[in-house]
Amino acid sequence: MTGTSYSAQAKKRAPLHIKPEAVASLNPSACLALPQSPASRASLEEALRWIFPSPVYQAIEDECKTFQMRDHRISFNQAELQMLFDARKLSQPETPPVAWCNAFAVYEEKEEGLRRRPIFEPLVNDIIARSVNPLLSVRTTYTPREDIRRAVFLSECGAQFDYSAWFDQIPLHPELRKFFGVSTASGTFVLPLLAMGFKPSCQVAQALTNSIRDVNIANVFSGSCVDNVLFTGSRADVTAASTSFIQRSESVGARLKSKTIELRTAYDFLGEHYDHVAKTRCLSQKTADKAHYALNFLRQRKPSTTKQLRAIYGLLLYAAGTLRIVVARFHWAMRFMSWFASTPEDRLHVIPSDVRTELVCWAQVASENTPVAVWEEEVEVDLTIYTDASATGWGAISVSKGGSVLCLSQPWTVHDHAAWNLSSSVAAEPLAIRKAVAALVPRTARRVLLYTDHESFCFASEKSWGKAYAYSCALQFLASYGTKFDIRHIAGEFNPADVLSRARHMPGSFTGPPLLPVTAVGDSVFNSREEGERGQMG
């Protein structure tokens, strides 16, 4: 998503992005010889089976004999193919190819202008994706974003590096190139390099990066995502780690865009902006600019394709994770997403007015890009609360860190019955949580463990919104309370609040009303009077 539009002629004139100086510069075997942790070495050994002869390719070759491959396509002209061949990104086959690649270019907008990046998509991806053979499983693990944020919180500065055309630096063993054929009108080529469009490519690239950045210097954090590397710590320690990393890169032929060590206290990394002094994070300027564009786009009130909406929602959800935006505030926008997401990419949608209002508000908050605390230290639990609901009331138990216990049992009010369908646990359980928190949690509490036997609400809390309106209301209430709530599931038979919700609201009964049924949450089931009146989305 960008704010610039280009004519068809401008796109046609955009040059192919090729860096011949980096092609096949890396020696992957040398990476195995580097000093590194056992975990890094094990990950690297697993990844290298995709670029060296291994049982993986015997399994692929066996499946190629019966697998119905898609038709392959190519969008490069003869002059462009010659450029790719001269840059050693294509080579002549030594044996006839057994599988083919799609070959095309994607547009990239850079400061110097529009350019086209050549992409090769091996059709053996389909075999890997559909195979039940465990040999063909692909596992890629990136540095968790929360680990990066914690490192910024605990450190003085950072230094980052970026490999130049990283995939082009990684050679494919000659015996494997027959699985990566490129068919043209004038002849046949094969790929001598790791293809960016190959399903296991990120696993290979990430494992190689992890191996090289494993400098083993105390008090230094290192993180990476494919070709981007970050070191944080004290100035002296980061300088030492960066120097070692540069030397290790040179020793295996890995080319960096720059070998200059720049120690910074504020910088962008993987879409977020970090400040070591203020200890804050926000969106990078590039991502914030995209949020501005999304805001202006939404204000135009034009019909949008599924592809455009997916891009907008992806950006807004990313911003929510960075800026701690409460997604539950935008319940109807999220319901709309669950409706359109599976429709064809080119289908046009008219965004309902209430959904558009929420999306504009969301994009406005994202574009303001107000910094938030980069990381929050774990604090001691002040209270543990158990909640439960029945058709006639709710109950809760609060246990303080000092061990004092407070029990509460209340019937539903007339207003509760008027506002919510309390015969459904999907509405009753979240309402019980809201009432229990309001009654039992002081505003001074910093952290609360909240147990419920309503498992669907636990899933909703992990996503920060619930498909049921009652879930989103409860999550928004908890987010605005100023306390950190950890939502945990407890089986109903072990929930001590169960008897408090059921046993005291039916005179003459020792057992109380029956347990509430767990109502399905779906497009045709509504759990409050308000949601029912609004009608089904779409």
Predicted features by range, described:
Residues 126-136, 169-171, 217-252, 273-282, ...:
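Catalytic palm subdomain of template-directed nucleic-acid polymerases
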Residues 68-206, 248, 285-334:
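Catalytic-core region of right-hand nucleic acid polymerases
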Residues 202-246, 258, 436-452:
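Active-site palm subdomain of RNA-directed nucleic acid polymerases
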Residues 437-497, 502:
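RNase H catalytic domain
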Residues 186-211, 297, 400-431, 439, ...:
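A short, polar/acidic, helix/strand-boundary loop motif
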Residues 21-62, 106-119, 164-189, 204-214, ...:
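Reverse-transcriptase-like RNA-dependent polymerase core
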Residues 3, 7-137, 224, 323-357:
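Reverse-transcribing Pol proteins
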Residues 263-374, 498:
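C-terminal reverse transcriptase regions that engage the nucleic-acid substrate
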